[in-house]
């Protein structure tokens, strides 16, 4: 079925493939080669509007100037001492989302949002405290990556869907964005991580696409009781069922799963918790990523001591579970894991 482009508000051009952009320019009465030019200006030269594309005639630029590419505006930008940058991006409808650029010597990672706000309301996370507005469209996800790439003036190498929102409650647009980021920006699927708190049947559905992305499951607890306290939706999705679905995912995709585990002092950080967690991890390809808690003002959780963090990690390692400790970047800019919310810092 041929996609129609009759009105300026119908389809932002960002996210469309070369073939679709070629179709679009032909529908506007232009030769097919203009499609490649448009593609290059959108994905490689960072055009914010069609009026920016100087290889097009002035007359045609004026005729198509109201058709949206689909770019956001940087509403606010804050930089942490470790060079991590947090962006508040203003969307076309006025909503604000957060994106984080995390540079190292060899990498530039972008932490992207998949929703405006988050409906999951995890007890330790700032994003859920602000409520939920809507899903992001695919072009609004792609735009976040382009924004960071242009601001840093270097190529993005890795993408993590660990910003605002639950990606598997917006699977259609997240997968469309992943395909475009892979095909149009040249970012390998294995360098893209999709994080989820665990939505019944969605991990199984994701497995059917047989993507080479990394799946990160936010577990955060070693048993059902603790998990229900941290993640309200866990009441409707028993831990045993979630682990079973994760095992099925690994079997189908042949890809290792990463389990994210936020360490909260005197709540889920004891060696007994580690041993209980290990029982769930045996028998399939997985890795546990420990995240020392990053404080937010709304709750009273505390970060464990360095000694407790290492003790927990060692307890997992003794059970032959692959484990690492992730010390979040951007803490001073409120850009670390669990701190994202659409507000200035």
Curated annotation (Swiss-Prot):
Details of cofactor binding: Binds 1 [4Fe-4S] cluster. The cluster is coordinated with 3 cysteines and an exchangeable S-adenosyl-L-methionine.
Catalytic activity: adenosine(2503) in 23S rRNA + 2 reduced [2Fe-2S]-[ferredoxin] + 2 S-adenosyl-L-methionine = 2-methyladenosine(2503) in 23S rRNA + 5'-deoxyadenosine + L-methionine + 2 oxidized [2Fe-2S]-[ferredoxin] + S-adenosyl-L-homocysteine; adenosine(37) in tRNA + 2 reduced [2Fe-2S]-[ferredoxin] + 2 S-adenosyl-L-methionine = 2-methyladenosine(37) in tRNA + 5'-deoxyadenosine + L-methionine + 2 oxidized [2Fe-2S]-[ferredoxin] + S-adenosyl-L-homocysteine
GO terms classed as biological process: rRNA base methylation; tRNA methylation
InterPro entries associated with the record: Aldolase_TIM (IPR013785), Methyltransferase_A (IPR040072), RlmN_N (IPR048641), RNA_MTrfase_RlmN (IPR027492), rRNA_lsu_MTrfase_RlmN/Cfr (IPR004383), rSAM (IPR007197)
Entry keywords, A to Z: 4Fe-4S, Cytoplasm, Disulfide bond, Iron, Iron-sulfur, Metal-binding, Methyltransferase, rRNA processing, S-adenosyl-L-methionine, Transferase, tRNA processing
GO molecular function, one term: tRNA (adenine(37)-C2)-methyltransferase activity
Gene3D superfamilies assigned to the protein according to its UniProt record, in alphabetical order: 1.10.150.530, Aldolase class I
Domain Radical SAM core per the UniProt entry, residue ranges: 104-332
Disulfide pattern: 111-337
SUPFAM superfamilies from the UniProt entry: Radical SAM enzymes
CDD domains the record matches: Radical_SAM
Sites where the protein binds [4Fe-4S] cluster: 118, 122, 125
EC id: 2.1.1.192
Subcellular location field: Cytoplasm
Protein family (similarity comment): Belongs to the radical SAM superfamily. RlmN family.
Protein's job: Specifically methylates position 2 of adenine 2503 in 23S rRNA and position 2 of adenine 37 in tRNAs.
UniProt protein name: Probable dual-specificity RNA methyltransferase RlmN
Source species: Trichodesmium erythraeum (strain IMS101)
Gene assigned in the entry: rlmN
């Amino acid at each position: 079925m041929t996609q129609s482009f009759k009105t300026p508000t119908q389809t932002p051009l960002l996210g469309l493939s070369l073939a679709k952009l070629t179709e679009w320019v032909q529908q506007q009465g232009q030769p097919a080669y203009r499609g490649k030019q448009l593609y290059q200006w959108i994905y490689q030269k960072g055009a914010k509007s069609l009026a920016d594309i100087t290889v097009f005639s002035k007359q045609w630029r004026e005729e198509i100037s109201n058709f949206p590419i689909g770019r956001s505006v940087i509403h606010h930008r804050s930089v942490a001492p470790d060079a991590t940058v947090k962006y508040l991006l203003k969307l076309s409808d006025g909503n604000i989302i957060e994106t984080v650029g995390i540079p190292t010597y060899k990498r530039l990672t972008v932490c992207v949002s998949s929703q405006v706000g988050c409906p999951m309301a995890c007890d330790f996370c700032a994003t859920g405290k602000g409520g939920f507005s809507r899903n992001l469209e695919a072009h609004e996800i792609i735009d976040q990556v382009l924004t960071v790439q242009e601001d840093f003036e270097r190529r993005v190498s890795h993408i993590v869907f660990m910003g605002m929102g639950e990606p598997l409650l917006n699977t259609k647009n997240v997968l469309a964005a992943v395909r475009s980021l892979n095909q149009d920006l040249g970012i390998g699927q294995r360098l893209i991580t999709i994080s989820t708190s665990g939505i019944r049947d969605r991990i199984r559905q994701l497995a059917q696409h047989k993507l080479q992305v990394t799946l990160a499951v936010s577990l955060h607890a070693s048993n059902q009781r603790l998990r229900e306290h941290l993640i309200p939706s866990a009441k409707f999705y028993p831990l045993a069922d979630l682990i079973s679905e994760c095992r099925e995912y690994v079997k189908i995709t042949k890809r290792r799963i990463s389990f994210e585990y936020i360490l909260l002092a005197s709540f889920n950080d004891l060696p007994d918790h580690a041993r209980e967690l290990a029982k769930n991890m045996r028998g399939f390809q997985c890795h546990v990523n420990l995240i020392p808690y990053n404080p937010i003002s709304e709750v009273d959780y505390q970060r464990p001591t360095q000694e407790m963090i290492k003790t927990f990690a060692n307890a997992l390692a003794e059970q032959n579970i692959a484990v690492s400790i992730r010390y979040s970047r951007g803490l001073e800019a409120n850009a670390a894991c669990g701190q994202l919310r659409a507000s200035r810092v």
